[in-house]
Amino acid sequence: MAKERVDVLAYKQGLFETREQAKRGVMAGLVVAVLNGERFDKPGEKIPDDTELKLKGEKLKYVSRGGLKLEKALQVFDLSVEGATTIDIGASTGGFTDVMLQNGAELVFAVDVGTNQLAWKLRQDPRVVSMEQFNFRYAEKTDFEQEPSFASIDVSFISLSLILPALHRVLASQGQVVALVKPQFEAGREQIGKNGIIRDSNVHQNVLEAVTAMAVEEGFSVLGLDFSPIQGGHGNIEFLAYLKKEESASNQVLAEIEEVVERAHSQFKNE
């Protein structure tokens, strides 16, 4: 398990605007772990880099800060899940599921290959169907009681090229998708830097060109593209793609890719 300084992690997770503020905040005892409330007061202390942090006394909007990714996507792509049956692929603790519910989803299939990760409050919600130890790449329409019209994808250590064919089988015609594109799991091994981090904007651009082209081949139009407001593991920049299942699929973001990558690198240039 890779480790990171507490102050650096707090900064990367957006708790502070600068590294110096993060350092002072940690020293003041303002930073705690979301999971167990453990308080950190030594900026240089190294903790697992997947430790989710929050400010002391802060009430998180969703069960996971990761929910902010889908929140941004719904806003920038002007999407609605009101009254919809949806799938959260790679649900984990359920940040995306929580966003969907708070935005009026009628039913959410929370799918994950792992077990015992979904937040307790979501497990107890009658609108949530928890599907643990479920490998979505083998999913079939019959696995779901209702046909979903919206899906989110946030998976790790697997390419979207293994997820989209299954989603095409399951999703309703004209169904909408928000997919988190993680270049570190899409690029060739030779393109990935130290500690699994990709810093080269050209690699990001190449990955987005390849992934969006692949999505079209799998029957999804690519209608929107932006960058995730939160960096992924080890500080990787990640991207949000808006897809739609259509008979005549097309890539409508090709001309935007370079500009989106530039904005992302500008946003995270000091991180």
Regions found by a protein language model. Give the residues of each.
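Conserved class I S-adenosyl-L-methionine
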Residues: V81-S92, M100
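Glycine-rich SAM-binding Motif I of class I
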Residues: G94-G95, N116
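Conserved S-adenosyl-L-methionine
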Residues: V99-L107
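S-adenosyl-L-methionine
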Residues: V108-L162
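A short glycine-rich, Lys/Arg-flanked "PGG" loop and its adjoining helix->strand segment in the class I
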Residues: S161-V178
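Conserved beta-strand signature within the Rossmann-like core of class I S-adenosyl-L-methionine
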Residues: Q174-P183, A187-G188
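Flexible, glycine-/basic-rich loop-and-beta segments that form/coincide
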Residues: I237-F239, L243-E271
